Amino acid sequence: MHPIGASTAVVFGTVGERLLSHKSFTAIWDEFARTGLPLSVHMGRSYPPFDQLVETRLEAHVIAMGMPAQLGFVALVAQGMLDRYPDLKVAFLEFGAEWLFYVVGRLAHYLPSYRRDPTVRAMGRLPEKAIEEYLTSGRFFIAPEADDPLLPQEIALVGAEHILFSSDYPHGEGRDNAASEILQRGDLTDGQKRSILFDNTVRFCGAP
């Protein structure tokens, strides 16, 4: 993939009705790890049962396209894939970032009891560290919307160095002035703005 100029590989939050961590994909992940490329999890209608629920584009965006972010996060972070592949970097793109508070909170609630359960431990699919440690490890990135009112809280959760710039351009809900919106925000420091608009993309993808 490097010889053809790839700077990241892109997947959806699930592979059909299977999580990204499903054992049938182990050989694929082993081979991908050898490339050294970062992984981008992209918004999309990847989980077929959701299509039975939605009837409008709004429902599709919020449910069928949005909820696979949580499914992908559970697979990659909560089921130990970042432990099995210690050089893997992961970004969640076009999902926004509000969803992260819910899934991190739920995992923090359930994981302590699961770690005490020998039958769960025997499956070998629990993360070795606290979830918060992965968020600030330099290997996990999110892409909030430029006008996200929770951006300061998201920075507090993952660190400013893990926030990627997002505009959704040229989608219908995209923002053609997203960079200006970041620059004009009064709740970010100049250093945080530079990190979001430039430095963090280099951290994730490498220098252009």
What is each residue range found by the language model?
Residues 1-79:
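Active-site gating/metal-coordination segments in enzymes
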Residues 9-11, 39-41, 90-92, 140-144, ...:
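Hydrophobic faces of well-ordered beta-strands that scaffold small-molecule active sites
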Residues 13-16, 42-46, 95-98, 145-147, ...:
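Active-site beta-loop-alpha junctions enriched in small/polar residues
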Residues 21, 49-56, 96-115, 151-158, ...:
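Histidine/acidic-residue-rich catalytic or RNA/ligand-binding cores of hydrolases
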Residues 27, 33, 86-87, 159:
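Proline-centered flexible-loop/turn and helix-kink motifs
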Residues 43, 78-82, 86-133, 137:
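Aromatic-lined glycan-binding groove of carbohydrate-active enzymes
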Residues 70-73, 119-125, 143-147:
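A general structural motif
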Residues 79-80, 88, 99, 126, ...:
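Mid-to-C-terminal alpha-helical segments outside catalytic/metal-binding sites
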